[in-house]
Amino acid sequence: VVVPYQKSQNVDHLRRGALAKWASRSAIILIAGLGIHAGCDARELDPAKTYLPATRFSIIDVVPPAPVQGDARYDADREIFLKTRGLQNSDRWRLATRDVSERPADLLQDFSGPAGLNLTPQNAPRLTALLVTAAADTARVNNEAKNYFRRQRPFKIDAGPICQPAAEVSDSYDYPSGHTTRGWTWASLLAQLLPGRASQILARGRAYGESRIVCGVHNASAVEAGRLSASATLTVMQRSPRFQADMAAALRELDRLKRQAAANSIIGTPGDQIIPSIFTPQNHPERVGR
């Protein structure tokens, strides 16, 4: 069912070509020793610190408009937010709380099980640099849509518990989800590099985005848009010579780690178990990665 979008007055006054400076807490990404920094306008990218082409790429033309009252997606967002408040203090709530972190070391740990490898910034510096640089690019582009739609976060619309301090997210917008964009960027690239573990890796990336719904800081529609935003931007950067070179370097690094893991018989970790979607019916048989 295609629901026609009705532009709200608070969106009408926004200038289509405007880009806000990246001022959120995720604007600066720094890994000691890697020298990776992201803090500029999407149209002022330093060629040495981005995989994006110089040509203009507008994510606003790609993602669906943010839901407004009268849109069926708006009503679905309200229902999902209220129902998922019942997950407070559950195992899934605790996972969502852990997924609040965007630190590269924590993300590498989260994806280690699905990847079947112990990944750290120390043993995989080229992989870490690739993922951080790509995620900075996808986040910059995603921020354009955030500042265009300026949609409120769900806990500002309906009352309910959230899994992180409201002050950490109250000064930024809901749609599309930046956390989801980051998680899907990491998952997509890791799945490209480790296709034999793609199911487990992509499922973890999906769960990372769904954690924002469970946490109560993003609407379900914002999570869906965050995945699309990441995928679209990743598609645009594929032809970048620097991106291709960094992918090749990361692949060599992973091949070395796989050889070391095989020698120590540690491939095949508890991460083989795929985290069920929060939208999976209770009677759906649990699936295990192959």
Regions found by a protein language model. Name each.
Residues 43-214, 246, 257, 279, ...:
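Hydrophobic alpha-helical bundle signature of multipass membrane enzymes
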Residues 208-236:
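Interfacial helix-loop-helix junctions of multi-pass membrane proteins
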Residues 25-35:
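Bacterial N-terminal signal peptides
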Residues 189-193, 232-236, 240:
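Active-site catalytic microenvironments for nucleophilic, acid-base chemistry
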Residues 1-21:
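N-terminal secretory signal peptides that target proteins for export/translocation
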Residues 34-46:
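Bacterial Sec-dependent signal peptides at the C-terminal "C-region" and cleavage site
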Residues 21, 175, 218:
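Catalytic tyrosine of NAD(P)H-dependent dehydrogenase/reductases that use a Tyr as the general acid/base
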Residues 242-290:
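Acidic, carboxylate-rich catalytic segments that either coordinate divalent cations
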